[in-house]
Amino acid sequence: MATTTSCSLLLSSTLFLHSPPSSHLSFFNLSSSRSSPISLYPIRSKRYFRILSKLSLNDNNRDDDDDTLHFTPFSAVKPFFLLCTSVALSFSLFAASPAVESASAFVVSTPKKLQTDELATVRLFQENTPSVVYITNLAVRQDAFTLDVLEVPQGSGSGFVWDKQGHIVTNYHVIRGASDLRVTLADQTTFDAKVVGFDQDKDVAVLRIDAPKNKLRPIPVGVSADLLVGQKVFAIGNPFGLDHTLTTGVISGLRREISSAATGRPIQDVIQTDAAINPGNSGGPLLDSSGTLIGINTAIYSPSGASSGVGFSIPVDTVGGIVDQLVRFGKVTRPILGIKFAPDQSVEQLGVSGVLVLDAPPSGPAGKAGLQSTKRDGYGRLVLGDIITSVNGTKVSNGSDLYRILDQCKVGDEVTVEVLRGDHKEKISVTLEPKPDES
């Protein structure tokens, strides 16, 4: 291939001087700064060689015969001829070089299209990020010198659109202590928000904004009961104020338990994930690979306050019931037994399993049903109260088990409580009531 190319170039340069009868070419004098044109006309061979023999370096030598070749000195054409020959030879050597051929194998090709999983992630983000909002928590402060009342940003967090009526779901700790709340949608429009209601025990709150319905994109709601460890999850939020940030990971664990930041009450069945969750992600959605909501990002385990690969989300099955009550009634009507119980560690030291009743006020459901409190006798000796071992046939080993069972009940439900009283067991029927401050 290289030989053929070089030969073709040499032949072309030769034919350039031996033009066929019908040709007429113009180019520039390579040896002159004047760039005067050179013309080639048809000639006869004998006449051609005779003219070449008379050519000199004098540019004024001309032949005025009809068959004249109007030509600059041959010295002007010679460099061009040599240049063509050199180029042909160089190209021949270059094409034949094996080093160049081997190097060509490493040329970077045009980037290919995104892979299938990448396209799915991009599509998931584009479809769901319009549902995610940025929440600014403003607190009222009074200037010590001017006594002016100022609104100072106290914190920020994330949330998501629940419905077309403008309800926004987030964490309670995101809005706690706020005097003024503002919600920024994906198109950067900002609206004042009002608190519809909140559940401190589960760290869930619902806000409402007066926004046009065409600006509201409710998030698709999924289920969390059938989640599996290892499946992909996606978190969208505003970490450190960086709005609409996507992080990915997997479900690292299920049925975890964390405590409510407001009340200390345990939140059960929490989802653990290694998707990066940082300050500002609180209240944002955790999505499965189909783009449906499976949890609310609420906490991280980190000594430094930044993501350490251990994040927690409240499962959507828990959130759904709470949000429905908050939207309808502005509060959560959660059933209670009406008791105070001992820390789990204290019961473990007794060598028994269950929940030790410390106090069952007579006005509460458990007190009305006859559950006994822990007390001291006339000699000052401690007399243990009832130890709850099961509710409706479900074993109760600690306080978390009791809360989990009650979360599945409603106000007015009658439950059967089995207790250990002294050295014997008893079953007592208790009618559940709402918390006094929620009635």
Curated annotation (Swiss-Prot):
<dbReference type="InterPro" id="IPR001940">
    <property type="entry name" value="Peptidase_S1C"/>
</dbReference>
<dbReference type="GO" id="GO:0005634">
    <property type="term" value="C:nucleus"/>
</dbReference>
<keyword id="KW-0645">Protease</keyword>
<dbReference type="GO" id="GO:0009534">
    <property type="term" value="C:chloroplast thylakoid"/>
</dbReference>
<keyword id="KW-0934">Plastid</keyword>
<dbReference type="GO" id="GO:0005829">
    <property type="term" value="C:cytosol"/>
</dbReference>
<comment type="function">
    <text>Serine protease that is required at high temperature. May be involved in the degradation of damaged proteins. In vivo, can degrade beta-casein.</text>
</comment>
<keyword id="KW-0378">Hydrolase</keyword>
<dbReference type="GO" id="GO:0004252">
    <property type="term" value="F:serine-type endopeptidase activity"/>
</dbReference>
<comment type="similarity">
    <text>Belongs to the peptidase S1C family.</text>
</comment>
<dbReference type="GO" id="GO:0009535">
    <property type="term" value="C:chloroplast thylakoid membrane"/>
</dbReference>
<dbReference type="InterPro" id="IPR001478">
    <property type="entry name" value="PDZ"/>
</dbReference>
<feature type="region of interest" description="Serine protease">
    <location>
        <begin position="154"/>
        <end position="323"/>
    </location>
</feature>
<dbReference type="InterPro" id="IPR036034">
    <property type="entry name" value="PDZ_sf"/>
</dbReference>
<feature type="active site" description="Charge relay system">
    <location>
        <position position="282"/>
    </location>
</feature>
<dbReference type="GO" id="GO:0030163">
    <property type="term" value="P:protein catabolic process"/>
</dbReference>
<dbReference type="GO" id="GO:0006508">
    <property type="term" value="P:proteolysis"/>
</dbReference>
<comment type="subunit">
    <text>Interacts with PTAC16 and other potential targets for degradation under high light conditions.</text>
</comment>
<feature type="active site" description="Charge relay system">
    <location>
        <position position="173"/>
    </location>
</feature>
<dbReference type="GO" id="GO:0008236">
    <property type="term" value="F:serine-type peptidase activity"/>
</dbReference>
<feature type="active site" description="Charge relay system">
    <location>
        <position position="203"/>
    </location>
</feature>
<keyword id="KW-0346">Stress response</keyword>
<keyword id="KW-0472">Membrane</keyword>
<dbReference type="GO" id="GO:0009579">
    <property type="term" value="C:thylakoid"/>
</dbReference>
<dbReference type="InterPro" id="IPR051201">
    <property type="entry name" value="Chloro_Bact_Ser_Proteases"/>
</dbReference>
<dbReference type="Pfam" id="PF13365">
    <property type="entry name" value="Trypsin_2"/>
</dbReference>
<dbReference type="GO" id="GO:0009507">
    <property type="term" value="C:chloroplast"/>
</dbReference>
<dbReference type="InterPro" id="IPR039382">
    <property type="entry name" value="DEGP1/8_PDZ_dom"/>
</dbReference>
<keyword id="KW-0150">Chloroplast</keyword>
<dbReference type="GO" id="GO:0042802">
    <property type="term" value="F:identical protein binding"/>
</dbReference>
<keyword id="KW-0809">Transit peptide</keyword>
<keyword id="KW-0720">Serine protease</keyword>
<keyword id="KW-0793">Thylakoid</keyword>
<protein>
    <recommendedName>
        <fullName>Protease Do-like 1, chloroplastic</fullName>
        <ecNumber>3.4.21.-</ecNumber>
    </recommendedName>
</protein>
<dbReference type="GO" id="GO:0031977">
    <property type="term" value="C:thylakoid lumen"/>
</dbReference>
<feature type="domain" description="PDZ">
    <location>
        <begin position="326"/>
        <end position="423"/>
    </location>
</feature>
<dbReference type="InterPro" id="IPR043504">
    <property type="entry name" value="Peptidase_S1_PA_chymotrypsin"/>
</dbReference>
<dbReference type="InterPro" id="IPR009003">
    <property type="entry name" value="Peptidase_S1_PA"/>
</dbReference>
<dbReference type="Pfam" id="PF13180">
    <property type="entry name" value="PDZ_2"/>
</dbReference>
<dbReference type="GO" id="GO:0010206">
    <property type="term" value="P:photosystem II repair"/>
</dbReference>
